Amino acid sequence: MKLNRRDFIKANAAAAAISAAGLSVPGAAVAQGKDEIRWDKAACRFCGTGCGVLVGTQDGRVVATQGDPDAPVNRGLNCIKGYFLSKIMYGADRLKTPMLRMKDGKYDKNGEFTPISWTKAFDIMEEKAKATMKAKGPNGLAMFGSGQWTIWEGYAASKLMKAGFRTNNLDPNARHCMASAVAGFMRTFGIDEPMGCYDDIEHADAFVLWGSNMAEMHPILWTRITDRKLSNKGVKVAVLSTFEHRSYELADIPMIFTPQTDLAILNYIANYIIQNGKVNQAFVDKNVNFKKSATDIGYGLRPTHALEKNATSNGYPDADGKPKGDTGKSDPITFDEFKKFVSEYTVEKVSKLSGVAEKDLKALAELYADPKVKVISFWTMGFNQHTRGTWANNLCYNIHLLTGKISEPGNSPFSLTGQPSACGTAREVGTFSHRLPADMVVTNPEHRKHTEELWGLPEGTIPDKVGYHAVAMARALKDGKVNFYWQQCNNNMQAGPNINEELYPGWRKPENFIVVSDPYPTVSAMAADLILPTAMWVEKEGAYGNAERRTQFWRQQVKAPGEARSDLWQLMEFSKRFKVEEVWPAELVAKAPKLKGKTLFDVLYANGVVNKYKLNETAAGFDNDDSKLIGFYIQKGLFEEYASFGRGHGHDLAPFDSYHQARGLRWPVVGGKETLWRFREGYDPYVKKGEGVKFYGHKDGKAVIFALPYQPPAESPDKEFDMWLSTGRVLEHWHTGTMTRRVPELYKAFPDAVVFMHPDDAKARGLQRGMEVKVASRRGEIQLRVETRGRNKPPRGLVFIPFFDAGRLVNKLTLDATCPISKETDYKKCAVKVTKV
């Protein structure tokens, strides 16, 4: 059957309509003649919005992409990055063969990168990993993964590290972007991920953006908000940030606040709601508990830092070796105690602290307080990359819970994601150093036991100790605690904090062996010892999970160039190099004698569950190189085993094949029907008739409102370093620019990073627009041009620098302070000075 793009769209219209209702129908055949473009659906490779695209291939190459008009998320639209997806795989410097640092024919830490075979690459990885385990045990190994991994890549990595090598030293780069959202959800609701969905946009009367420049970072969702506002009189938009950006163009209530004072603003809103008698008392009485948390929790810096030495509840070892308190500890309080706690956050006090006018604070609070106004709160990195990021998430939930504006169309607190599968892979699969699939954690013995049973492993296989998180991994490499480190699908040497002091030294430490899997020679790759060339996006069969709990699949469309192989294949092949006796203690092997002599591949992947789907089940007319090389339908096997964790436990995923037929489905998918709103009767299958609202993540079915104070940041401007620095993204580039800077049109649109600065700050320093300047912190310095006009307009005393530019590494300047609960880095607040070169 031959289909052009128009015919393909028509043929799938019915499928899209039915799948939107949670049903599935057979997918259209899309086999093409040699001379025609073949079109097939995929999820966009960039942000967490999860736009649908149509991928056009011809002669083994992606030649075009289009917005998918049948995709519910974007309805045929793509942002500027999405329109150029067809070019991201074809940069001139695409890696096609493994590269090892060598000198005189041997590996040398200071040698030149030299092409080698995959066999030799795995030989040296095996040698270095085994030497590390012999010297340091399994915790000498670490892997840093990604919210860009496909679902099955993350799941395979989690099995390999946590069960195979028996270390929880696995963390995703989502630690840098979504960990605070995870911790916030778990503390307030006992279960992760948003209760609402994008359909909320078409029902809302007001939108509040907290530290989220949706106009540039989630532009397709922004078009839906814009349409809602311009098409419906009375719809309001409030925007809060530390500097003005493009989202302010639509704002009815624009607010610029002093960094960190969002905590105080959130408490003021709660106080306003209470003082004005706008608490939904019936909702609160039935559905909410109140708690007060530990507050002297430090800033996630090294234990020797002055800010950590005196902290009483940062969890670090005290002189007696015991942890100093618990960063997440909380105790019950009453509503009256909460009322008294927030009463100090008056409009006068908060206006003075934050710099936001009293009238704007009142207008914002009234949006939440008015029972007739449906409100969505959107946030991204402004909340999450915050030394009190977990608290910020909790405080926003407080407001929605006090008013009952939650879990129904148009009323939703909504944490947006920045990566295409930060939800689907990092969070749901559980590739964090403390997590297992379906919101389980490694410290819970019942969770470990359940996981071991599903994986067919002896009890005690999974260690009970939380592994190193992202920032701790860097410190462990520097300190010599980790000697073997494998990074896949991210560019942490550019994206991680405090590069000069905490990242680079560990990578170049002589005894450490660093492996980077990437399609391109990134900053990370060039700092590594071994580079593995990686297949990307539609060069493999994949699955992502977006910010609204929508799981989306795509088929392999083209082959990867040269010898490039997927992250999944790399994990599989590496696992074949180790027998259980080499990595497990004898007493563990003795519990399962049938596993003796088997490789980790045999035990984890060829285990009778993952390998039960045959090659003839893969899609006809499409390549599936991973499955062909491995010998069975690996993607289906991994997915179905993984899905067994969530089915019946509030994380239900549909059968594998249905995702290839639908434009994504939002979990929980029960009885073939997706869930749009969680926790409310009539929408959520886990809320029984008569229960109304039930936050079933907690055993008592209630959510928690937390009493949490405003606290200052870890570092603020002073006489020497007199300006705030905030980092982030721009519309044209994504993260570190690995893909977007290799698209000529995107590169030309914004070729180099600049320092956005208030004109008066520039003038006071004798600087002019376009002038080259030095921006320095206590940790490093970079040179770049001054920009006093354009899209980003900082207030006096603050500068903004995007992090996409490999030639201007802004993370040389940033501080490696984190939220002590979530361990997420604060990239939004440190002190710098700007001087003329």
Swiss-Prot record:
Description of post-translational modifications: Predicted to be exported by the Tat system. The position of the signal peptide cleavage has not been experimentally proven.
Cellular component, GO annotation: membrane; nitrate reductase complex; periplasmic space
Residues that coordinate or bind substrate: 803
Family of this protein: Belongs to the prokaryotic molybdopterin-containing oxidoreductase family. NasA/NapA/NarB subfamily.
Catalysed reactions, as listed in the record: 2 Fe(II)-[cytochrome] + nitrate + 2 H(+) = 2 Fe(III)-[cytochrome] + nitrite + H2O
Protein's UniProt name: Periplasmic nitrate reductase
Subunit structure: Component of the periplasmic nitrate reductase NapAB complex composed of NapA and NapB.
Localization per Swiss-Prot or TrEMBL: Periplasm
Residues that bind Mo-bis(molybdopterin guanine dinucleotide): 81, 148, 173, 177, 210-217, 241-245, 260-262, 381, 385, 491, 517-518, 540, 567, 727-736, 811, 828
Single Gene Ontology MF annotation: 4 iron, 4 sulfur cluster binding
Segment forming the signal sequence: 1-31
Cofactor note: Binds 1 [4Fe-4S] cluster.
Compositional bias (Basic and acidic residues): 319-329
Keyword Chaperone set for record: no
